[in-house]
A protein has these predicted regions:
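Conserved hydrophobic/aromatic beta-strand scaffold that supports enzyme active sites
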Residues: 19, 35-39, 57, 77, ...
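Ligand-binding loop in jelly-roll beta-barrel domains
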Residues: 81-82, 90-116
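Short strand-connecting beta-turns/loops that link adjacent beta-strands
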Residues: 27-28, 53, 72, 101-102
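Residue-level recognition of conserved beta-strand positions in structured domain cores
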Residues: 37, 50, 61, 69-71, ...
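Histidine-centered metal-chelating micro-motifs
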Residues: 45-47, 66, 85-86, 90-96
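Conserved short histidine dyad/triad with adjacent acidic residue
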Residues: 36-52
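A short, N-terminal "cap"/entry segment at the start of jelly-roll beta-barrel domains
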Residues: 1-33, 47, 121-126
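A short beta-strand-loop-beta hairpin characteristic of the jelly-roll/cupin
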Residues: 55-82, 97
């Protein structure tokens, strides 16, 4: 068993976005998954991007946002709100915009794991 204290969790951030690295190969013996909690402030955007060799599952836990997708070469959008679940296969383009008035929160499960440090400007551990 592993137990990770909240004080040991790395928090990555960009303007309006915080990503809590709950479980990953840096703080766990698990080599199969990265689990994060992401907070997106009102008006903030996570730009469209992809993960070439990892699938990702997002579980919306609070608020309402807009998925920024690219399906068959066409940029599309889809409402994503608390209770919804979405799975992105390897290479699926995805992002998120918070058009709501409150913080949007989701849990992300990524396999195989990714070190998301490359995508964020700040870390509470650096």
């Amino acid at each position: 068993m592993e137990f990770i204290k909240n004080t040991e969790i790395e928090v990555l951030s960009n303007p309006g976005v915080e990503s809590f690295q709950l479980l990953n190969p840096k703080n766990s013996d698990s080599r199969r998954v990265t689990i994060t909690k992401v907070l997106v402030q009102s008006g903030a955007i996570q730009p469209r991007h992809l993960h070439e060799t990892s699938e990702q599952i997002w579980i919306a836990t609070k608020g309402k946002g807009v998925l920024l997708l690219c399906e068959n070469g066409t940029e599309t959008e889809r409402t994503f709100e608390s209770g919804d679940v979405v799975r992105f296969a390897d290479g699926d383009i995805h992002g998120l915009r918070n058009d709501g008035q409150e913080v949007f929160e989701y849990i992300s499960v990524t396999s195989p794991p990714i070190d998301f440090g490359y995508a964020y400007k700040k870390s509470n551990k650096k």
